[in-house]
Amino acid sequence: TAGAEVASRLAEAGIHVVVFEMNPRPYGKIEDGLPRWHEGLRAKEYETIREKLGHAGVDYVPNTKIGRDVSFQELANDWGFSAVILANGAWRDRPLPVEGADQYVGKGLIYQNPFIIWFNHCDEKNYAGERFVPEDGALVVGGGLASIDVAKVHMLETTRARLRARGIEQDMIELEVKGIPKSLEKHGLTWEELG
């Protein structure tokens, strides 16, 4: 979304813009960084990005990674661009600013991006990415909307796991929309009984 915003503003000012995107689609963190229950927000953001990149003065080039497919040197010196603007968004988690923390990645420390990507795809038959098993006693570090989403995913997934252990399959979207207490009530359960 960062690149689409910059491209749109420059194009509106009459500047021809080329947007290089390393992924097949231009949606960045909106595509896999939002938990799947944010369907309405995701659709709205997709449309906004399509509009911005659809401006007459914008050329969009997907599947092109700077440094792999084209060098920064080439862009800056050989392609005739008057400027190269790096608007690389939030596709990578910021590391936890605690010395030695990263040695625990894969041993209990889980960053938001891989966790939400797993959550968004874990019910797909062909999902081959990293897998997580949310358990009781987790700590979510952060104070923004992403940390709220992570805490919510954790709560929803631990609830679904406990229901599955009782032979009950529960649709995640329904669980999120109706809320855990009402969903449990539908199955004749309470928080206390679920454990």
Segments from the language model and where they lie:
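A generic local structural motif
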Residues: 45-47, 70-73, 122-128
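Gly/Ser/Thr-rich helix-start
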Residues: 29, 90, 145
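Feature captures the FAD/FMN-dependent oxidoreductase FAD-binding
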Residues: 48-99, 103-105
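Beta1-alpha1 glycine-rich phosphate/pyrophosphate-binding loop at the start
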Residues: 1-66, 74, 149-195
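Glycine-rich dinucleotide-binding loop and its adjacent helix/turn
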Residues: 93-194
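Short, ordered loop/turn segments at secondary-structure junctions
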Residues: 22-23, 89-90, 114
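Short hydrophobic segments within beta-strands
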Residues: 20, 87, 140-141
